């Protein structure tokens, strides 16, 4: 029994190291590669998915990161685990919507991007158990209770910096790029529709 308790107490540091040096890069790295694939195939063009698909990508990023933020801010209990699992399930549903949008668009989705999507789809389902291990012990309360973070301030800075640099900024850039292109396309369509009217007016004046 004593050896078992010692093994359980040693699990938490191992889970922390696995989260920081394996799980976090495994989530942010493919996410950044996915953004690069979108940029390379000009997702900002309306026919290539445009703003709608970019918003779906932002939603997926938030759904994947929500379990991490919840586990860092609140005590681990059945209610929190339910919320984290719900976020993971929501991520899967949004991923299915992303696939439907990609199939309808004209953008070429390479085999590399497809493999990246497959990897990202399963990420929340093994991140959630990892965060449960990282934030032991699990209480029996069914409420959200703030707790001291299981990670140090330095760890939190690494997580926040990584999420910002490899997640928030790239996908914000993608969304802004899509919105700008949508405005350009809208302005161009207005000008195109106005041109025939101007031509017909000139013809009547000439007559």
Question: Predicted segment positions?
Answer:
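Helix-coil boundary and interhelical linker segments in multi-pass alpha-helical membrane proteins
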Residues: 2-21, 66-82, 130-157
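Membrane-helix exit/interface motif
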Residues: 37-40, 63-76, 94-105
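Core segments of transmembrane alpha-helices
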Residues: 57-71, 119-129
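Membrane-proximal helix-loop-helix units in multi-pass membrane proteins
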Residues: 78-148
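A hydrophobic membrane-anchoring alpha-helix module
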Residues: 151-207
């Amino acid at each position: 029994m004593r050896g078992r308790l010692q093994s359980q107490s040693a699990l938490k540091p191992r889970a922390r190291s696995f989260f920081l040096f394996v799980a976090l890069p495994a989530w942010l790295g493919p996410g950044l590669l996915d953004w690069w694939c979108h940029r390379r195939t000009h997702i900002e063009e309306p026919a290539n998915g445009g703003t709608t698909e970019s918003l779906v990508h932002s939603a997926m990023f938030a759904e994947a990161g929500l379990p991490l933020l919840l586990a860092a801010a609140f005590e681990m209990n059945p209610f929190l685990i339910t919320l984290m699992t719900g976020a993971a399930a929501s991520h899967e549903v949004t991923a299915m919507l992303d696939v439907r949008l990609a199939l309808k668009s004209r953008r070429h989705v390479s085999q590399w991007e497809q493999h990246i999507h497959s990897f990202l789809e399963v990420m929340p389902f093994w991140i959630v158990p990892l965060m449960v291990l990282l934030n032991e012990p699990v209480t029996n309360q069914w409420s959200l209770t703030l707790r001291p973070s299981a990670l140090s301030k330095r760890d939190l800075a690494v997580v926040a910096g990584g999420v910002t640099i490899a997640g928030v900024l790239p996908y914000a850039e993608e969304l802004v790029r899509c919105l700008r292109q949508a405005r350009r396309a809208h302005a161009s369509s207005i000008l195109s529709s106005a041109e025939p009217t101007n031509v017909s007016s000139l013809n009547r004046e000439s007559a």
